Amino acid sequence: PDVSSRYDAVMLANLSPDHPEDRHIMFRRLRVWVLHHARTQEVSLVCLRNFERAADGSCIWNYHVPTGNGLSTDISLKIEMVAGKNQTRVSFLRRDTHGHEYLEPENPVKLIVRPDVEDRNFHYSTKANGLESVWPGKVNFRERGFDFTPAPGRTLTLTASSGRFVPAAEWNYMLWQPNEAARGLDPYSDVYSPG
């Protein structure tokens, strides 16, 4: 999923268990690449075939991703909220596709998944302005994920069911948000990825 507005995020949480309040963004964006034979291809809007909302309320993005040598593979990304919790489940599925233009199912591909995080009220934007030296120290790495605790009482926990987490801190500055630009608001935000 792409980001067009400051209100777009993988997860916007209501941090109060007692009453509704402004949403808080900590898990902003998810960037994904397909890796096959040392060739990476970003899973982006260019590859998007369609989008659907499933009967259970989850959202599914279906991608047709080039893998090299004129071949492709189909990947589905599903995002669902867990009822009653500030929890989002993200899952990937490689579709079983056949045909001369598809990579054979027995040829493995890997996914590189890079989450971008923030710590803000959903009405604001993140500006790095010194956070580059603070946020890396707020991340606790684990074999399959990390905990990001930017302030007491707020922790984002990301855990993968398989694979491994590779620490590789990166800031993306001036992430363009066209909806804010159209409204005459500051169209830029900064995001941090622990790895």
List PLM regions with ranges.
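Terminal accessory carbohydrate-recognition/targeting modules of carbohydrate-active enzymes
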Residues: 1-195
